[in-house]
From Swiss-Prot:
Protein name in the entry: Putative pyruvate, phosphate dikinase regulatory protein
Lineage: Bacteria, Pseudomonadati, Pseudomonadota, Alphaproteobacteria, Rickettsiales
One Pfam family named in its UniProt record: Kinase-PPPase
An annotated Gene Ontology molecular function: phosphotransferase activity, phosphate group as acceptor
Disulfide bonds: none
Protein source organism: Rickettsia peacockii (strain Rustic)
Superkingdom classification of source: Bacteria
Amino acids binding ADP: G150, P151, S152, R153, T154, S155, K156, T157
Amino acid sequence: MTKLIIHLVSDSSVQTAKYAANSALAQFTSVKPKLYHWPMIRNLELLNEVLSKIEYKHGIVLYTIADQELRKTLTKFCYELKIPCISVIGKIIKEMSVFSGIEIEKEQNYNNYKFDKTYFDTLNAIDYAIRHDDGQMLNELSEADIILIGPSRTSKTPTSVFLAYNGLKAANIPYVYNCPFPDFIEKDIDQLVVGLVINPNRLIEIREARLNLLQINENKSYTDFNIVQKECLEVRKICDQRNWPVIDVSTRSIEETAALIMRIYYNRKNKYNK
């Protein structure tokens, strides 16, 4: 395996650079990457600390930095070391400007940063996801954008949180074998309801690992194949009867599941808004 060092430098959370790096790395099966994360680099003092690390561990640099002087310092430093220094969204911004004929606006001033509606919508969505996790506060489901249902340990909670980071309010409700399901499923609701299912054998592995972590040995039904299989089949049945989409998460990451849900949600929203 070829080792590859990548430095992710950002004035925010480095997530954009991280997604770009991982997408590119997926094309190289023989590479063993080592990613160094350098978030919240917003002044020269912090940047100089990062530069010393880059000098010690040479590697490709991917960056998302708004401040022009910091960008110049970083790119000049990498040029002198003869290592690649790539702006993740720089070319995109430039092409947008050229195509639209609109000049790039002034650099971000973090000291005067204004929290916009998107920021507060995201905070509200995260708060909603936390308060409506695992079937809590069902009386407020009408406020949700998306409702996830599925057996325990089918990634409902992390998917709800991921959706929240994208500004969507998501509630999740577990389905437990032989337990009555909330009566909301018998009503006409406007929210998008999505069922999450998984291969029963895979779900048993996940549940057994969970029980071992908690040092619980008594709950045999939780990992019984027949019961686990019935839970997944029943969720499919509930969704099929109501024309709700079902997503098999057996081989999907949280990001992939959330992306598919968002695609369904926005396609549905666009259809109804025509």
